[in-house]
């Protein structure tokens, strides 16, 4: 929505097709251009179909935001099974690889583009999630930096946003995607309660989706043309402590 408010046409790819349609409808009702696609970001065919459809409907791909992600139930290595490990890695890391690879296929021939990957403060330390989530987000940070080194000279900037505690439905959405084999995540993790947030976040509150959207919009803008390979931490000062 924030990118659309700035004048960008937006294509939304979501496993929940209704959610993608809702986003596209909100944008078009506000006077913007949008297209919705249902698909799995961890499957190359779905990503290719969505990007190809978006380019056909909306024009050249200028910005790719790899935002899909799920939690892992906060399982440690001795608790998580291989199936859950692979599913989390597929969505949280392989999805970023696939989205970036498909975006580069359009951006590199034109010599311009912006890729913004959603990482996490869990990708910068050993807390903030279970084993699979922390490993995947570290992978996103590393992949972002490697791609920036390789492709920035060809006109494509590549950065990551690392949110701290944010007011979202990520726990509930993760639960719905992963199914009943994952424990209730509503009370698990760091900074679950308001009291915990105040104790670990100097700003004294959770962040909002608008806080994250502002960071994404900056990294996607012309003003950020010399910013690449950067991990922008948006955590209310959590990691500064």
Where are the language model's segments positioned?
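Alpha-helical segment proximal to the catalytic Tyr-Lys
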Residues: 105, 149-150, 225
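Canonical Rossmann dinucleotide-binding motif of NAD(H)/NADP(H)-dependent dehydrogenases/reductases
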Residues: 1-11
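Substrate-binding pocket helix/loop in short-chain dehydrogenase/reductase
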Residues: 75-77, 81-89, 115, 197
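Residue(s) in the substrate-gating loop at a strand-loop-helix junction
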Residues: 120
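Short, small/polar-rich loop/turn modules that mediate ligand/substrate recognition or access, typified
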Residues: 152, 157, 227-229
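Active-site helix of classical SDR
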Residues: 100, 136, 144
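Short C-terminal tail/terminal secondary-structure segment
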Residues: 71-74, 125, 216-217, 228-241
């Amino acid at each position: 929505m924030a990118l659309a408010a700035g004048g960008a046409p937006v294509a939304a790819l979501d496993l929940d097709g209704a959610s993608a349609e809702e986003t596209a409808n909100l944008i078009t009702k506000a006077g913007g251009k949008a297209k919705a696609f249902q698909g799995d970001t961890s499957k190359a065919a779905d990503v290719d179909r969505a990007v190809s459809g978006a380019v056909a409907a909306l024009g050249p791909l200028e910005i790719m935001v790899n935002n899909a992600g799920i939690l892992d139930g906060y399982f440690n290595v001795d608790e998580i099974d291989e199936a859950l490990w692979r599913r989390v890695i597929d969505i949280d890391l392989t999805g970023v690889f696939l989205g970036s690879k498909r975006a580069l296929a359009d951006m590199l021939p034109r010599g311009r583009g912006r890729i913004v990957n959603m990482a996490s403060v869990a990708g910068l330390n050993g807390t903030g999630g279970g084993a699979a989530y922390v490993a995947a987000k570290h992978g996103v940070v590393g992949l972002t930096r490697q791609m920036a080194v390789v492709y920035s000279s060809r006109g494509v900037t590549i950065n990551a946003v690392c949110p701290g505690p944010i007011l979202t439905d990520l726990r509930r959405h993760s639960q719905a995607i992963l199914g009943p084999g994952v424990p209730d995540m509503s009370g698990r993790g760091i900074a679950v309660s308001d009291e915990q947030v105040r104790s670990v976040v100097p700003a004294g509150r959770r962040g909002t989706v608008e806080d994250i959207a502002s960071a994404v919009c900056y990294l996607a803008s012309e003003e950020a043309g010399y910013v690449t390979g950067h991990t922008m931490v948006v955590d209310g000062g959590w990691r500064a402590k």
